[in-house]
Amino acid sequence: MFILNNRKWRKLKRDPSAFFRDSKFNFLRYFSAKKFAKNFKNSSHIHKTNISKAQSNISSTLKQNRKQDMLIPINFFNFEYIVKKLNNQNAIGVYILPSNLTLKPALCILESHKEDFLNKFLLTISSENLKLQYKFNGQIKNPKSVNEIWTDLFSIAHVDMKLSTDRTLSSSISQFWFRLEFCKEDKDFILFPTANRYSRKLWKHSIKNNQLFKEGIRNYSEISSLPYEEDHNFDIDLVFTWVNSEDKNWQELYKKYKPDFNSDATSTSRFLSRDELKFALRSWEMNGSFIRKIFIVSNCAPPAWLDLNNPKIQWVYHEEIMPQSALPTFSSHAIETSLHHIPGISNYFIYSNDDFLLTKPLNKDNFFYSNGIAKLRLEAWGNVNGECTEGEPDYLNGARNANTLLEKEFKKFTTKLHTHSPQSMRTDILFEMEKKYPEEFNRTLHNKFRSLDDIAVTGYLYHHYALLSGRALQSSDKTELVQQNHDFKKKLNNVVTLTKERNFDKLPLSVCINDGADSHLNEEWNVQVIKFLETLFPLPSSFEK
């Protein structure tokens, strides 16, 4: 039975022939899948059913039926999407999410449920207009018919699969890989065909959830009522600092307090906004959905597009975390002395600039170990040594001042800056440092612009203090910094290419589009940056009105 919703009525009026053609095809396709399932005799013998060319050829299905005429677009196409669809079909099995989301998740089905699962799986990918590929006999295979899929999948115990769709609003095909496994069942245990993070051999008496392998597609971790040792039992928040140089009130204050001399600390390119925050939020919703709350620290009005009614978003003005004596401020060093004073912030948080963008799926484990130890992404080379020098970069002088404190405290010298990427931070450590170095914190807090006597709290001091006190470890995650004095077009295009290929091994954890040195005057830079942002993150997030 077909229900004519508003979209279908509009299509019927606009193009009657297309309406009846596609509606008929939808019905035939659904009927064909049901008929095929009914005619299937047993798992040891593939019944050869005569299926029309249009119905049996998966590639033809995708080509002949346009997504905009038949199905609503998919906002987020990933492994969770297909699990949800299979649960809607009442399929039975378990799924395993890897600790590293750039690895393949697994979908595990009992051999005794194989026939029923494949019926529902094929019906799902057909009704959702998805393209299926899988690795078979060492090669990636594009199956041409339902019979071919049945024959292949009944001959193996596990297979790597790729599902893709052009139904997203992105300019490219969306796709993901997962592992499909068929488990053998004994009266006492279930045996998985490959090793996994929990257990390959599952003793039935150890299963705490009696619905496992009996109802729905459930998380394999439900074998216990306790959290797994690698799971994080704490919330993680996200903090942005943000400024808009076009804000009228900000301009008046900047004009009033700007010193007579010019430096990179006072360059307007440092405060330029090309809506990077919008794209940064899109990247986090797409690739970092584990975040509990997002705090945006600013002395400007919120951008018009931001939905402050979203319960995940909290706008924080400088006066909420900084004393009146320090305001107004135009120094990121000053603001960063006070992030741990944000009301309601979790002890564990990630500090990010609005020009840091996530490029691939991440989870809590990319930023913290499950025991709370922070993961740092320090640069591979050292830069910090010597005394503060007038005319040297402000970030470097701030790191030098921090280095002096670290040498006195730990009797070790440090040289490595943190990469331009999201930073894993803990408020308890920041409070501890503020108490230990009150004079240095207070002096930096009251500098209107970056100054020679600043300490770089989040840029240097925190990371090495946490590392040397045993509360942080270095991570090997790759990150990418793009500046106007780089071959920026090549760098940006490379990230786009790797993203389209879903090449997570080569993709950096994040990319930083770093303005500065009057980069806003470089027209080619501006064009390429905007093109990059709109290509990588074209879909609005739930944080937008």
Curated annotation (Swiss-Prot):
InterPro entries: Stealth, Stealth_CR1, Stealth_CR2, Stealth_CR3, Stealth_CR4
Keywords for this protein: Exopolysaccharide synthesis, Transferase
Record EC number: 2.7.-.-
Primary enzyme class: transferase
Swiss-Prot/TrEMBL GO biological process terms: polysaccharide biosynthetic process
Further information: Stealth proteins are part of a protein family that is conserved from bacteria to higher eukaryotes. Family members were first identified in microbes as proteins that help pathogens to elude the host innate immune system. Microbial stealth proteins are involved in the biosynthesis of exopolysaccharides. Stealth proteins are predicted to function as hexose-1-phosphoryltransferases.
General function of this protein: May be the polymerase that links individual UDP-N-acetyl-D-mannosamine monomers. In serotype A the capsule is composed of repeated units of (alpha 1-6)-linked N-acetyl-D-mannosamine-1-phosphate.
Stated name of the protein: Capsular polysaccharide phosphotransferase SacB
GO MF: transferase activity, transferring phosphorus-containing groups
Pfam families in UniProt: Stealth_CR1, Stealth_CR2, Stealth_CR3, Stealth_CR4
Family of this protein: Belongs to the stealth family.
Domain of life: Bacteria
Signal peptide positions on this chain: none
Gene: sacB
